Amino acid sequence: MMESLLQTLLNGAATGGVYALVALGYTLIFSVLGVINFAQGALFSLGGYATYLLMGGRIGVNGAWPGLGLPVALPFTLALLVAALVTALASLLVERLAFAPLRRRGAEPLQSLITSLGAGVVLVNLLQILMGAEGYAFPAGAEALAGLPDMLILAGARIRTIQVLLLAICAGAVVLLSLWLERSRSGKALRAVAEDFTTARLLGIDSDAMVRLAFALSGVLAGLGGGLVGLSVSLTGPYFGISYGLKGLAVLVLGGLGSVPGAIAGGLLMGLAEALVPADASGWREALAFAILFAVLLLRPGGLLGRIQPDKV
Amino acid sequence: MIDNGLLVQMLLGALLGLSVYLPLAAGQLSLATPAFYAIGGTLAALLSTRWALLGGGADGSLPLPSLLLELLLAALLTGVLAALVGGLVLRLRGIYLAIATIALVEIVRVAILNLPFTGGAVGIFGIPQPFADASGYLLPVLGLLILAGWLCQRLEALPLGQAMAAVRDDELAAECLGIDTTQVKLSAFVLSAVLAGSTGVLAAHFLNTWNARQGTFDVSVATLAFVILGGSRTWLGPVFGGMLLTALPELLRPVGDARLVLFGLVILLGPVLAPQGLITPALLERLGSLGRGAGR
């Protein structure tokens, strides 16, 4: 009993770590531009499929070119990093197509919710046409991670190495990001732009470059998340990232829009809450995040660690 | 090329477009239309297959008054639900409405999939038919569309419609003018929900089967594309967009697989290339003066 509870909690924390990555991706862009990038979930999918293909995975029977694959077979860690680079570039493309033209025109921020949703829908459906709707497991041997065993024994419980690794990588990414935001020169510049777009520009900070930086970083987070989920759970069709993206929105509201610690705490809480849903109600698990979202809106609209910012005139 | 069945689908698309248009006319991005559409359809499917009082015959027929009763009940249910959800969300900034309505669509989808009486993944089938064939549906669907269009047209002259336009153009300014902006946004949201719910009732009978796939995130995207293509400055925009984008994938078969790519491109590029959509008030004015010129 103890053993299974520990496993459940660790599973929940691992999923929660991924939710935190998604929510942080939203938070980076929200704090700079005050809008949500609805394409985040699709970038997450792209990260998973890019990792799969870079590891030597082939397109399945329902894809556009069955049996075709990249002429490379990278080890998982390397594939994950290259995939994160791919999603960073894709995220920059999303900024270029869905955000930059509207920002230049001074359009309503609401408009970029619509355009980024469009970018995400195009991306995920192109993936669907290319790869088919079928599920993919990562190539055999992927689990043999740098000589680590498949299972670890922790306090008498058998735990999948990948879960621990996933949590460690999420934690590492979060810590690095926070340190960078707090300490580095460009991190400070990014926070200055987040505080006040125009003033930062007057102070000589290249605001547009900072916006691109925020998109590239959130793309990296999406790529890491997608690749890690692909390895630990498998890819369940191109829409798997959308599902993480939607739950990331609930996490965002739970933690408080624009709050970095809120995104992390909200992600972990959400992952644990889902893991504790009993097996005979598992069909309802998908709705739990959104039920929590409404509860938060009812009880504490600013989120756990956020505050509602009044609109500026 | 366009048979009666497709024409009914196009009109249903126009109705869903109007449902997305109404909150947008008050500057609010709501993606909840599929949730209320799914609730309306599920209600109709449940009532007409389970409730003997409605008189669903063994031959699969349904008396017309029963259809009207379903419409009334669906409008009531979705209206109350929208008032509850909207009351929770609409005092916050616009982004919260977009997020909360996505959440609502997911909750309703999971509920329809998991509730013990909605038929699970298969759904409810053999829904009784109030009309003998597709052409019979033209009249009620067109009737609902005319009613909704008339309402939208009337709104432009009524205080509520003018307040909606004021909130869309500048919410803070509208508030300073003494407009109860939350109330205005809520009214638009409830109207949108009632329209989507009623459309769901007609769609459930027309389609003959109903399941959780009728109200998904994809439908949010499709219905949003209707409005972005047609334009949200006049109610004719979403009607045009809904009819065109419903017909297009059916008429161009090869597009079938890629229809969501098409919808995605519309909402990615639309706000950049044609911020007002294809049907703008200026265009209507030009058409109007052309018509007068020809008549003279």
Give the location of each predicted region.
Chain B
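Transmembrane alpha-helices and adjacent helix-loop boundaries
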Residues: M1-R296
